[in-house]
A protein has these predicted regions:
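Alpha-helical transmembrane segments and their helix-entry boundary regions
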Residues: 8, 76-77, 85-88, 139-140, ...
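Function-critical hydrophobic alpha-helical transmembrane segments in multi-pass membrane proteins
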Residues: 130-152
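A short amphipathic helical element positioned immediately N-terminal to and/or at the very start
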Residues: 77-82, 121-122
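Alpha-helical transmembrane segments in multi-pass integral membrane proteins
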Residues: 1-7, 14, 21-43, 57-76, ...
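Residues within membrane-spanning alpha-helices of integral membrane proteins
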Residues: 9, 13-16, 47, 53, ...
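Specific transmembrane helices
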Residues: 50, 55-59, 81-110
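Extracytosolic (periplasmic/ER-lumenal) interhelical loops and adjacent juxtamembrane/interface segments
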Residues: 112-131
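Generic alpha-helical transmembrane segments of integral inner-membrane proteins
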Residues: 17, 48, 90-98, 102, ...
Length: 312
């Protein structure tokens, strides 16, 4: 029997804690002028979510392997994925409509009804992130499009082109990492770095794809993966800390290098945590482990509700 990997729970709990912290810090920044750097924590947190999601879903895709060429297998993957994510998403979409009606309509915020078709089909931030309504849903749109298109590429490549699964997996992963970098290099976004780049579907597939690359390396080189767990953890923390400092102190809004490569650097820092997180089977005593597991279990719902709660 395999031991439960608690390090992944800790990584998920840290990710949601950073997101919640950012939303609270944003309130204090707008109201009291607290340091702007604290409003960047969520960028790190969401990227941790993306890397972790890619690692876990990539593992499922590797387990399915060549069987993804069968329509029934591919369909079951999408249905199971949809059942895990869509009910909560659409529930909170409706809750946000009610939230606008009760709290935000009187403040003069526009009626979100014309925007709803975009949210239903995850188009609210496909090419740009401008909508004020249900703002935290941007990352869910990134994930839903990725997990529609990447398995679709596997299905078509296996069934129509007869490409060997591992070669196809790596080719699609490389495209999903490289293409967003090229798109970020080509864009001249008039918006700030966070809204114009990091929250746009077309510019973020690399954040998930790097997790798919990581799990494939884990499966291929398990001994080296375990041996490097502590050096990799230290390097990942250092990279994320440096990225966080730059986002708060530097000027990513007016830097081409930041627009193109900073998301990739944060991706790298996030994925470097995975060798430790994916091999850690104990979090110590129950006083620490139990709340970590609880936060990790409820992280998706916490993500959907915390911004709305903090702006009530």
């Amino acid at each position: 029997m395999h031991k439960k990997v608690h390090g992944l729970d800790l990584m998920r709990a840290v990710a949601i804690a950073l997101v919640v912290f950012q939303h609270g810090a944003l309130f204090f920044y707008l109201c009291y002028g607290s340091p702007v750097i604290w409003t960047k924590a969520g960028t790190i947190g969401v990227t941790l979510f993306f890397a972790l999601s890619g690692f876990l879903i990539g593992g499922l895709l590797l387990d399915l392997g060549p069987s993804l060429s069968e329509p029934g297998v591919a369909a079951r993957f999408w249905v199971r994925r949809a059942l895990r994510t869509l009910p909560n998403y659409y529930l909170f979409l409706l809750i946000n409509v009610g939230f606008w009606w009760v709290f935000q309509k009187a403040r003069g915020l526009p009626d979100p009804a014309p925007l709803l078709p975009r949210y239903v089909f995850f188009l609210q931030n496909f090419t740009g992130q401008r909508a004020w309504f249900f703002a935290e849903s941007w990352s869910l749109s990134v994930e839903e499009w990725f997990y529609l298109l990447f398995p679709l590429g596997l299905f078509l490549g296996l069934r129509l082109l007869r490409i060997p699964f591992k070669r196809l997996y790596w080719a699609l992963t490389a495209v999903m990492i490289g293409l967003p970098v090229l798109l970020r290099a080509a864009t001249l976004s008039p918006e700030d770095w966070e809204r114009g780049i990091t929250k746009v579907v077309l510019y973020r597939p690399d954040s998930i794809a790097i997790g798919l690359a990581a799990v494939a390396l884990f499966r291929r080189f398990p001994q080296a993966w375990a041996r490097l767990r502590l050096p990799s953890l230290a390097a990942g923390i250092a990279v994320l800390a440096a990225s966080f400092a730059y986002m708060g102190i530097g000027d990513p809004d007016h830097s081409t290098a930041a627009r193109v490569f900073l998301p990739l650097v944060v991706n790298l820092g996030s994925v470097l945590l995975l060798p430790w997180a994916s091999t850690c089977t104990s979090l110590g005593g129950r006083a620490f482990a139990v709340p970590v597991r609880a936060v990790a279990r409820w992280s998706y719902s916490l993500y959907l509700v915390n911004l709305m709660a903090s702006t009530t």
